[in-house]
Amino acid sequence: MDIVGGQNLRQMWDDLAGMYGDKTALIFESCEGIVRQFSYASLNEEINRTANLFYYLGIRKGDRVALHLDNCPEFIFCWFGLAKIGAIMVPINARLLGEESAWILQNSQVSLLVTSAQFYPMYREIRQDNSTPLNHICLIGEQLPADDGVSHFSQLQARQSATLCYTPALSTDDTAEILFTSGTTSRPKGVVITHYNLRFAGYYSAWQIALRDDDVYMTVMPAFHIDCQCTAAMPAFSAGSTFVLLEKYSARAFWDQVRKYQATVTECIPMMIRTLMVQPATPTDRQHHLREVMFYLNLSAQEKDAFTERFGVRLLTSYGMTETIVGIIGDRPGDKRRWPSIGRVGFSYEAEIRDDQNRPLPAGEIGEICIKGIPGKTIFKEYYMQPEATARALEPEGWLHTGDSGYQDEDGYFYFVDRRCNMIKRGGENVSCVELENIISAHPKIQDIVVVGIKDAIRDEAIKAFIVLNEGETLSEAEFFSFCENNMAKFKVPSFMEIRTDLPRNCSGKIIKKNLK
């Protein structure tokens, strides 16, 4: 079944502008509360001007351009402006530092970068090192340096025509993006995403949440992340909805923003839910228009129940990763939701639980979650310039090895156990970090928790818990270990605990465990 029908991203925006015209497409709110708004017609014009800007700077079909930006309308302009001329976006996590960013530039052979003034000093050093192909920087901001090889994005973009001047032949098989994975355990890999992938993501995710053109989809997820792009922006635009993009997350402001924009759909990660729950309760907590809150792993049953009861919302669970493009397993329209299940497989996909010999397992047995899709269409095409890594993850028949552990029940509902790399081998027993984290997070003094395995000469690995306490709380080792012993099997009780003020996280809220070992 081909639901894309040969429509590339250039055709998508031309069609949307013609169909929805003056209807609001994008609302952006900065940290300072400044709001910028664009209709479908005006947003398409901004995209065309940006495409013409890239052409003016020498970018042609197949060229790669990096974006190092926080959430802003210019990210949207660049993303689709590059796609319209067949060029390739390489988004860079805005939290990365110089060495990490330079590594991505080098590995994707990027010569042009779009970034903001705050990141310019880092890239000036990278250019001076001559360690990457980077030779031109286009800066977004007001007060910009007059350095060689630097241009002013807004000034140049404003001079461009609103009509596209370069229209090379495009195919839905063309690469639209190289998105580097978060690399929480190793160097990131460049996930190759096609025009078809993005168009399919729009239709699929809109189906998953039954999105309509009168919906308002609000997100604070970073635009350089697959979630914002394929679970929020693409479905919102594909359905003709209004997409509300917030610059950054504020626990104090978020629920007011939900009400302010009359959002009907939003998305939350566990960190957001936990920080929202520590805000003072108000009589207006349940006064909103939300019908769905997209949710991504992991949350304890107590946390989930407390959140849904206080705010009067329901969570729509979705499971996926950069390589799957969308949430390929999740709560489906019309399905009964079966917490803590991550849902059932979505349309066009197959899913199996497999053992270490790559054989399918029956219901109830834990193994690796494997997904079957079509490379370059419903799942990623390949890892950029890494054929061996591609071959390890992706079978010729389209089966993707996720590296995650889970099981399914007799009714086809799937359950996530843990990232396979997060399973701790302790004296012959396999211990799930997520299971322990969910148990320990129920302690009333604990705000945040992560469990890791550390080397142990006798038992292979020992278990260590890193803890963030609620403000003003204290917790002794004796109290902590007593709680664990009363709530889990003896072999699962951590050997060590460490109290910290915070935990290292990447852009999507995932804890960077390699920084804790």
Curated annotation (Swiss-Prot):
The gene is caiC. PANTHER family: ACYL-COA SYNTHETASE, MEDIUM-CHAIN ACYL-COA LIGASE ACSF2, MITOCHONDRIAL. Signal peptide: none annotated. Its EC number is 6.2.1.48. NCBIfam families: PRK08008.1. GO terms for molecular function: carnitine-CoA ligase activity; crotonobetaine-CoA ligase activity; medium-chain fatty acid-CoA ligase activity. This is Crotonobetaine/carnitine--CoA ligase. The keyword ATP-binding does not apply. It holds the Pfam family AMP-binding. Pathway: Amine and polyamine metabolism; carnitine metabolism. It is an enzyme of class 6 (ligase). It catalyses: 4-(trimethylamino)butanoate + ATP + CoA = 4-(trimethylamino)butanoyl-CoA + AMP + diphosphate; crotonobetaine + ATP + CoA = crotonobetainyl-CoA + AMP + diphosphate; (R)-carnitine + ATP + CoA = (R)-carnitinyl-CoA + AMP + diphosphate.
